[in-house]
Regions:
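Conserved GNAT acetyl-CoA-binding A-motif
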Residues: 125-134
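Conserved acetyl-CoA-binding loop-helix of GNAT-fold acetyltransferases
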Residues: 101, 107-124, 140-148
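GNAT-family acyltransferases
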Residues: 1-104, 121, 125, 159-160, ...
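Conserved acetyl-CoA-binding loop of GNAT-fold acetyltransferases
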Residues: 147-157
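Short histidine
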Residues: 135, 142, 154, 169
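Short, Lys/Arg-enriched C-terminal cap helix and immediately downstream tail that follows
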Residues: 130, 158-159
Length: 194
């Protein structure tokens, strides 16, 4: 099943990634500040091309899989960030979200605005019961994004992951479908095709 694109918010266009995004994708994932708290990167151009090819999948994921989205500011026509949504568990109707944005576009609320749309997709379009986000505990801006969405911090794991040569703490945030509906009002309708 595929989502019909684009999705739009007040200021953003959320669309499928494509091989044409390679220059912007490389710029994002080669920036040490962008990848500081990610499990991977920075990437050289060939690694960025390979990474983008794996992320340019249109089908919604099965359990354990992820789908990635490109984000543009309306009227600008360039990739300014990427969103990700993982299908964690069918049994528990659990999805996870993630996001990466160009630092030149930081502080404008784009990460929260775009992520809100994919959280809405998980709940209204895909029937999620729970949506979560995980992050390096040092990544305060990322924590603020999830807090703006109404997610609560549910866990702080101490040195639970060994990433890029160091033990790191991880925070887990989450929100349930009834909580989301209370915050956001009526469900959004999404269009899908087979």
């Amino acid at each position: 099943m595929q989502l019909v694109y684009p999705l739009t918010t007040e200021r953003l266009v959320i669309r499928a990634l494509s091989p044409d995004d390679v220059d912007r994708h490389h710029a994002l994932f080669s920036d040490p500040d962008v990848v500081r708290y990610l499990y991977f990167g920075p990437f050289d151009r060939p690694a960025a091309q390979e990474h983008l090819a794996r992320r340019s999948i249109l089908d919604l994921p099965g359990e354990g899989g992820w789908i990635n989205f490109g984000v543009e500011v309306k009227g600008e026509g360039i990739l300014v960030g990427e969103l990700a949504m993982g299908f964690i568990s069918a049994t528990h109707a659990h999805y996870e979200v993630g996001y990466v944005f160009d630092p030149a576009y930081a502080g404008r609320g784009y990460a929260a605005e775009g992520t809100a749309m994919i959280v809405e997709l998980a709940f209204s379009g895909l029937g999620a019961h729970r949506v979560s986000g995980r992050l390096d505990a040092r990544n305060d801006p990322s924590a603020r994004v999830l807090e703006k969405l109404g997610m609560r911090r549910e866990a702080h794991f101490i040195e639970n992951e060994y990433v890029k040569g160091e033990w790191t703490d991880e925070l887990v945030y989450a929100i349930l479908a009834p909580e989301w509906r209370t915050l956001r009002g009526p469900a959004t309708e999404f269009e899908f095709r087979k």
